[in-house]
Amino acid sequence: MKIAVLGGGIMGEAIVKSILRKKLAGREDIVISDVAKSRRDVLSTRYKVKVTEDNLAAVKGADVIVLAIKPQDFPILLGQLAGRLKSQLVISIAAGISLDGICSKLNYYKVVRAMPNTPAQVGKGMTAWTSAKDLSNKDREIAVSILAAMGEEQYFADEKYIDMATAISGSGPAYVFLFIEAMIDAGVHIGLPRNVATKLVIETILGSAEIMKKMAKHPAELKNMVTSPGGTTTDALLQLESGGLRSLMINAVAAAYNKAKSLGAK
């Protein structure tokens, strides 16, 4: 399987790394295009794959084309590809760009729209995806193999859920990192060395996520398991709730969702 990845940024690189790790394609069968010579040099050295600045050269002979560029650059890219596709599977990972927006400009319908996230860099990604209705079972299987190589994948028959997933899992790592940063700073504030605070926070986050995944309990129930009457945790939770953490998170996710929708409307 020959794969062209158009865009060698963080997510484009994560896809290439995942494909190689899962041995879905050999190094000689992957081409990455990127406008920045510095990125091409890095990717060529790091993964021993072919690189080019020419999108059309990259897609020549490809079985799968991954569109991993910024949403604002899509009009130019789709214009370059229009009329040049015959049987390739196209996978777009651009936020907010709808299937109809891609298919209509390409006049081509073997298209998957996906929203991975940055933990894909370490094989722990969460990718939401949908596809054009007439996509064959074979192409669907290829899409699943590539997306699952990055971690977990979730298919949605209704495309409206992709913008919602963008606001949760696509942008979500940034929310988590902000929370982690704040907890580390809090640890330093009360006297912990930063490296110790960092370890405590990271392991707490990882352990909490793992216990929720394995025990399959509602987060409120798990929270109550930590909270003793009159204890330290209840005082901390009172401050978080009084400060509006819950409503801030809801409003933040809603803002990201609205932004994702607006990108598709442009």
Which residue ranges define each predicted feature?
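NAD(P)-dependent Rossmann-like dehydrogenase/reductase catalytic/cofactor-binding core
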Residues: 202-266
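Small-residue helix-packing motif on alpha-helices
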Residues: 30, 58, 193-200, 222, ...
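Internal alpha-helical scaffold of NAD(P)-dependent oxidoreductase catalytic cores
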Residues: 105-110, 126-164, 177-214
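Short pre-catalytic strand/loop immediately N-terminal to key active-site residues, enriched for Gly-Thr
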Residues: 111, 162-167, 219-224
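Rossmann-like NAD(P)(H) cofactor-binding subdomain of soluble oxidoreductases
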Residues: 37, 46-47, 55-60, 64-129, ...
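NAD(P)+-binding Rossmann beta1-loop-alpha1 motif at the extreme N-terminus of oxidoreductases
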Residues: 1-46, 50-53, 60, 105, ...
